[in-house]
């Protein structure tokens, strides 16, 4: 983990990855997010914690849930929010991401929520940030998506309790190219998950050591037995073009979550998916919309998690 996330006193300065993040810091963020979520039940309030603070969502890749969630989170904390769109900005004229950051900093922006297609891009920007400026990684390449990992953990706590020591969690699908899977794996390890199972086609499983300590297999039905939670990953359709998946139909046959398959898992197993869902590919309609689905709960928890992160970094 990069040490630049923490200041000399061990306080969070940026949120770039969950890898190596101290357990105490992770728990503090989750506890605070839970408090915010519970306080907001039945009402949507606006606070003034970040009144007068400018936050910019700096996205170099498309996003719906993450960008909207951060925008709402910052607004509810009273921040002034700027939305940066790379397609209509000076980056089209050749301006670098670093220069964009420094120019916005000069205008008084203190918080940057950054999504970028390149691994390590957000950390590189953080090295250029001035004192008092905080960066949040909203997804870079295939390396990290820390707030998604946090909201997944918050959703698991809500569904299964705070003690993860006996949890059997299955991560299914395109793990190799998934920044969400990597963040979830780091968080689950830090929180002491009892057993982490990883399942998918061999062509979509990473070989860089990230799965060390996990139970890894390609037989989805076998991996489902007794599972407490299932994290279904989006099949990135471009992988078909690379020849890594023969067809959507075959993928669904082997790794799609159906009602019949779900019955193999533990009673009341929680079903998670980071979205966007390819219905009929990773998961059927009846499971995605069923009683065990936590998909919309994940979306709702995302706002609380991002409020907690913004408050911690900028409040």
Swiss-Prot record:
Role of this protein: Catalyzes the condensation of carbamoyl phosphate and aspartate to form carbamoyl aspartate and inorganic phosphate, the committed step in the de novo pyrimidine nucleotide biosynthesis pathway.
Protein name per its UniProtKB record: Aspartate carbamoyltransferase catalytic subunit
Residues annotated as binding carbamoyl phosphate: 65-66, 115, 145, 148, 275-276
Pfam family name, one: OTCace_N
GO BP term, example: amino acid metabolic process
Pathway entry: Pyrimidine metabolism; UMP biosynthesis via de novo pathway; (S)-dihydroorotate from bicarbonate: step 2/3
A GO term from the CC aspect: cytosol
Residues at which L-aspartate binds: 93, 179, 234
Gene responsible for this protein: pyrB
Quaternary organization: Heterododecamer (2C3:3R2) of six catalytic PyrB chains organized as two trimers (C3), and six regulatory PyrI chains organized as three dimers (R2).
Catalysed reactions, as listed in the record: carbamoyl phosphate + L-aspartate = N-carbamoyl-L-aspartate + phosphate + H(+)
SUPFAM superfamilies, per database record: Aspartate/ornithine carbamoyltransferase
